[in-house]
Amino acid sequence: MLIITRKKDESLMIGDNIEITVLKLEDGSVKLGINAPRKTTILRKELYEAVKEENKKAMNIDMNLLKGLKK
């Protein structure tokens, strides 16, 4: 893991086209601004994990349910 220290209004770059800027530091939290191409999906990690888990659940298909569709 790379650890970088930034102050308010300082940025870091990921590749050539993603910029992350520290906008606000308050009460133990950090507000970040992210400039990235529109096609780039940006999710908080807890939301990303929830989506990943739901996708796994969706892949578990009950074959008995599919048999009813053949009729």
UniProtKB/Swiss-Prot annotation:
Coiled-coil intervals: none
One annotated GO biological process: regulation of carbohydrate metabolic process
Main subcellular localisation: cytoplasm
Cellular component terms per the entry's GO annotation: cytosol
Annotated keywords: Bacterial flagellum biogenesis, Cytoplasm, Repressor, RNA-binding, Translation regulation
A single GO molecular function term of this UniProt record: mRNA 5'-UTR binding
Pfam families xref list: CsrA
Localisation per UniProt entry: Cytoplasm
Subunit and partners: Homodimer; the beta-strands of each monomer intercalate to form a hydrophobic core, while the alpha-helices form wings that extend away from the core.
Family statement: Belongs to the CsrA/RsmA family.
NCBIfam families in the record: csrA, PRK01712.1
Function summary: A translational regulator that binds mRNA to regulate translation initiation and/or mRNA stability. Usually binds in the 5'-UTR at or near the Shine-Dalgarno sequence preventing ribosome-binding, thus repressing translation. Its main target seems to be the major flagellin gene, while its function is anatagonized by FliW.
Name of this chain's protein: Translational regulator CsrA
Organism: Clostridium botulinum (strain Eklund 17B / Type B)
